[in-house]
C-alpha cells in the first residue's frame, strides 16, 4: 500500500533521528531552557529578520492553536475563521473547550478576506444587543489553507491592515508553512509573514520532525507570561530539548525548505497528470495537497493500491479526494499513481 492520504505517515528525516541519537545521553536543563532550544530560537529569529519576537516550542498543532488563542482572547471573545478552517473542523472543539467560540465565515476557497473580517466586526459593534453576543477578538487563518490554497502577499497585507483598524489579533497557523512558502505560486517570504501578524507557527510534525511546532510571537500582550499559558495547557514539555534538537537539525542549512520544495514539486507533477487526463480539481492548490475529482470506479480501483483521503462527494458518480505528498514521498510513488491512472484510461 502506497500512502498518499496525509503528510505525517512517515517518522522523521534521518538527520533529525541521528541528532536525537547523538544527543540522547546529554544532560540539559528541562522545559526548553537548554542550549538546543536557544540555538533553534536564534535560527528562527534570523530567518524572520525581525527583532522583538519570542519563539516557543510545542508538541503539536492543535496544542499550539489552542494555547495561543486562549492566551489572546478575553473570556467573552471569539476568533474569526473560515468555515473550513482547521480550528473549526478538525480540532474536536478544542477552541470551544477553552470557552471561546469560533466565529465561522463561509468561504469557497478556504480563505478569508479583509472585507469579510470587517463585516463580522462591524456587524457586532453596530448591533444594539452586542453585549449578549460573542465579541470578535482575533482572526485565525492558515498558510496554506485547509484546501491547499494560498494567501497572496496582498491578501495577507489587506487582512493585517483590517485587523489593525479593527483592533483584532491576526494569527497564522503554519502547520504546513514550508509547503506554502516553497510553492511556485507563493509570492511572500517568511519575513513578509513575520511583519503581518501578531503570531504564527512553523510546523514540524508534517514537515520532517517526529513532532513539534515552533510558535513565533511579536505582540507584547501575547509575549507576556506566555510560558505560563503553555504550562497551563499541558504543553510545556519537560524534555523540551527534544524539540530544540529537531528544529536545529532541520533549520540549520535550509533542509526544512528543501524538503518542502520536494513535496510541492511531486504534488504539482500529480496535478498535471490528473489535469492532462481530463480530471478537474476541486481547489486551485499549488501546494503538497491536491484535490482531484475522480469517477467512483477509478477511486475504487486506486484504493486497492493507494491510501487516499476521501474529501467530499461531488455527485452521484464522482468523489473529490485529497492526494498528499510529503517531505519523504518517493518519486516512484508518484509514478505508480500515474501508471494506475493510465491503466484506468486503457480499460
Which stretches of residues belong to each language-model region?
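Conserved N-terminal alpha-helix of the aminotransferase class I/II PLP-enzyme fold
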Residues: 14-61, 83-88, 94
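Conserved PLP-anchoring active-site segment centered on the Schiff-base-forming lysine
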Residues: 71-89, 118
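Conserved C-terminal alpha-helix-loop-beta "cap" of PLP-dependent enzymes
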Residues: 74-76, 268-345
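Hydrophobic beta-strand scaffold residues
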Residues: 79, 102-103, 170-172, 281, ...
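PLP-dependent aminotransferase-class I/II
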Residues: 99-137, 141-146, 151-158
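Active-site C-terminal subdomain of aminotransferase-like
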Residues: 108, 135-136, 142-145, 150, ...
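Catalytic PLP-binding core of fold-type I/II PLP enzymes
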Residues: 151-183
Amino acid at each position: 500500500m502506497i500512502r498518499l492520504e496525509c503528510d505525517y505517515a512517515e517518522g522523521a528525516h534521518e538527520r533529525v533521528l541521528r541528532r536525537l541519537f547523538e544527543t540522547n545521553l546529554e544532560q540539559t536543563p528541562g522545559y526548553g531552557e537548554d542550549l538546543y532550544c536557544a540555538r533553534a530560537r536564534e535560527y528562527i529569529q534570523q530567518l524572520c529578520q525581525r527583532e522583538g519576537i519570542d519563539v516557543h516550542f510545542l508538541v503539536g498543532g492543535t496544542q499550539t492553536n489552542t494555547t495561543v488563542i486562549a492566551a489572546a482572547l478575553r473570556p467573552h471573545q471569539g476568533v474569526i475563521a473560515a468555515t473550513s478552517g482547521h480550528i473549526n473542523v478538525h480540532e474536536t472543539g478544542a477552541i470551544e473547550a477553552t470557552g471561546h467560540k469560533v466565529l465561522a465565515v463561509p468561504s469557497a476557497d478556504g480563505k478569508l478576506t479583509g472585507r469579510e473580517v470587517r463585516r463580522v466586526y462591524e456587524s457586532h459593534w453596530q448591533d444594539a444587543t452586542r453585549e449578549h453576543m460573542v465579541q470578535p477578538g482575533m482572526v485565525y487563518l492558515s498558510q496554506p489553507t485547509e484546501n491547499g490554497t494560498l494567501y497572496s502577499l496582498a491578501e495577507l497585507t489587506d487582512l493585517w491592515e483590517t485587523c489593525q483598524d479593527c483592533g483584532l489579533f491576526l494569527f497564522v497557523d503554519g502547520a504546513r508553512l514550508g509547503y506554502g512558502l516553497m510553492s511556485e505560486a507563493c509570492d511572500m517570504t517568511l519575513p513578509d509573514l513575520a511583519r503581518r501578524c501578531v503570531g504564527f507557527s512553523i510546523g514540524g510534525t508534517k514537515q520532517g520532525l517526529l513532532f513539534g511546532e515552533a510558535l513565533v510571537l511579536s505582540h507584547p500582550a501575547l509575549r507576556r507570561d506566555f510560558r505560563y499559558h503553555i504550562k497551563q495547557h499541558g504543553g510545556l514539555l519537560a524534555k523540551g530539548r527534544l524539540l530544540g534538537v529537531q528544529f536545529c537539525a532541520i533549520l540549520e542549512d535550509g533542509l526544512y525548505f528543501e524538503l518542502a520544495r520536494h513535496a510541492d514539486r511531486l504534488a504539482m507533477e500529480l496535478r498535471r497528470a490528473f489535469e492532462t487526463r481530463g480530471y478537474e480539481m476541486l481547489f486551485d492548490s499549488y501546494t503538497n495537497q491536491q484535490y482531484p475529482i475522480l469517477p467512483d470506479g477509478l477511486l475504487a480501483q486506486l484504493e486497492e493500491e493507494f491510501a487516499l483521503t476521501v474529501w467530499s462527494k461531488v455527485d452521484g458518480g464522482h468523489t473529490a479526494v485529497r492526494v498528499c505528498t510529503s517531505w519523504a514521498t518517493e518519486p516512484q510513488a508518484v509514478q505508480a499513481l500515474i501508471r494506475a491512472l493510465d491503466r484506468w484510461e486503457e480499460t
